[in-house]
From Swiss-Prot:
The gene is tig. SUPFAM superfamilies: FKBP-like, Triger factor/SurA peptide-binding domain-like, Trigger factor ribosome-binding domain. GO terms for cellular component: cytoplasm. Its EC number is 5.2.1.8. Residues 159-233 form the PPIase FKBP-type domain. Involved in protein export. Acts as a chaperone by maintaining the newly synthesized protein in an open conformation. Functions as a peptidyl-prolyl cis-trans isomerase. The lineage of its organism: Bacteria, Thermotogati, Thermotogota, Thermotogae, Thermotogales. It is found in: Cytoplasm. This is Trigger factor.
């Protein structure tokens, strides 16, 4: 079998395979045996008919079996020599007594071109600006939390705290029965459980209905047990002492908040930089993929979606009932997904980054917290579920790649407002 590359376009190669006379004879012999064992010819026992009779009676069947024989040989060679993104595609074939030729599309895994990490610019929010805002915000939260409550006889006003008994019914069923709740009547909260209470006094009963659609109407009955006026303590030494006995002065409280803020800042900035690193990697990498490959990927999934009428109509509606817009969205999805997958793999391969089984198992403690199960149960799941194991391994590999990029990239400090403005501008461009 001789292989000749006819054309090459990035990851796609069109190859012509030509078979020798001996291979043609072998293919015919195998094909005839297959057909002889399947067909019944009058006058002969099954599997005993002469090959020349089978050849003359079933020429197209024999030809089809020969093509399958050649196809299997080609696919085996491709599997051994290539890393495939798509199964091989038969483009053309020629089969005669003394000539056998097949033209095949081979779609390899695409490569990516990656910019030097030193060219990446990652943004880190200016720490002093963040800490100043964090301390101010935290002090105001503590001021609200430790407000002094003073019972009042008059009607409830905004910023008062109320204690109520709430009963909710629907369709004759009791959903909530006299549940005691305490909450603050904030002016910006327009829910009826707030707005309907303002102006009412202790001992009053408020009733109203809420329609949440789909024929579901809920009846609320709220008994007001207590109205309290909230007096905010000045942000001073008095507030510090109220928060905890370990603080004597406001400065001590501020120092404690700053230490807490520093720890949060470092964790959040670490994650923020790593997220930017991977985003920059994906955005700046060039995917070397043929349009023909993308077309094949899109049409394959498009046909699959179309077979599910409900799913197809839903997706079509999301894309202005335009099949071409849906195809374009699928294409963009594949481009982004492949850029991420293959750029991360390439960086990991070129920098000897890997994730061991022990490293995956060590994630069990974090997973246990996220999943709400024991650490031992999380470890058991990682051992028994290869799909989950591989998902965790992939996330850890992404983390290592991100850390490598952060080490080499240029990091610049920006003010929080600069970052907010950039985010608004990016959202505006995305909407347009």
């Amino acid at each position: 079998m001789e292989r000749v590359v006819k054309t090459e376009d990035k990851n796609m190669v069109v190859c012509e395979y030509t078979f020798t006379k001996d291979e043609i004879e072998e293919a015919e012999e195998v094909a005839l045996r297959q057909v002889v064992n399947r067909v019944e010819i009058p006058g002969f026992r099954k599997g005993r008919a002469p090959k020349q009779i089978v050849r003359s009676r079933y020429p197209e069947t024999v030809k089809s079996e020969m093509i399958d024989f050649f196809w299997q040989k080609i696919v085996k060679q491709i599997d051994e020599q290539e890393n495939m993104l798509l199964p091989p595609i038969l483009v053309d074939f020629e089969l005669s007594n003394n000539r056998a030729r097949m033209t095949i599309e081979v779609h390899r895994l695409p490569d990516v071109e990656i910019k030097p990490f030193e060219d990446f610019e990652l943004k880190k929010v200016d720490k002093p600006s963040v800490m100043k805002d964090y301390i101010e915000r935290k002090l105001k939260e503590l001021q609200q939390t430790h407000a002094i409550l003073e019972p009042k006889e008059g009607p409830a006003e905004y910023d008062d705290m109320v204690r109520v008994k709430m009963t909710i019914t629907t369709d004759g069923k009791v959903i909530m029965n006299q549940k005691v709740s305490e909450y603050v009547l904030y002016k910006e909260d327009d829910r009826p459980v707030v707005s309907e209470i303002v102006g009412k006094k202790s001992g009053d009963v408020v009733e109203f209905d809420r329609d949440f659609g789909e024929g579901k109407v809920y009846h609320y009955k709220i008994e007001i047990e207590q109205v309290n006026k909230r007096r905010l303590i000045d942000i001073s030494d008095e507030l510090a002492k109220t928060v905890s006995a370990e603080y004597e002065t406001l400065e001590q409280l501020k120092d404690a908040i700053e230490r807490e803020g520093n720890e949060l800042y470092e964790k959040e900035m670490d994650e923020f930089l790593k997220t930017q690193a991977l985003d920059s990697l994906v955005k700046t990498s060039q995917l070397l993929v043929s349009e023909r490959t993308l077309s094949q990927l899109v049409e394959t999934v498009f046909d699959k979606i179309r077979r599910d009428r409900e799913e197809y109509e839903k997706l079509l509606k999301d894309h202005d009932n335009n099949p071409e817009k849906l195809r374009e969205a699928l294409k963009n999805y594949y481009i982004t997904d492949m850029k991420e997958t293959y750029s991360i793999r390439k960086v990991a391969r070129e920098n000897n980054l890997d994730v061991s089984e022990d490293e995956v198992q060590n994630e069990a403690e974090n997973l246990a917290i996220a999943w709400g199960i024991s650490v031992e149960r999380a470890k058991s799941i990682l051992k028994s579920r290869n799909d989950i194991f591989e998902d965790v391994r992939w996330e850890l590999l992404k983390r290592k790649v991100a850390e490598l990029i952060v080490q080499r990239a240029k990091i610049v400090d920006v003010k929080p407002e600069e970052l907010q403005n950039e985010g608004k501008e990016a959202q505006k461009n995305e909407d347009n």
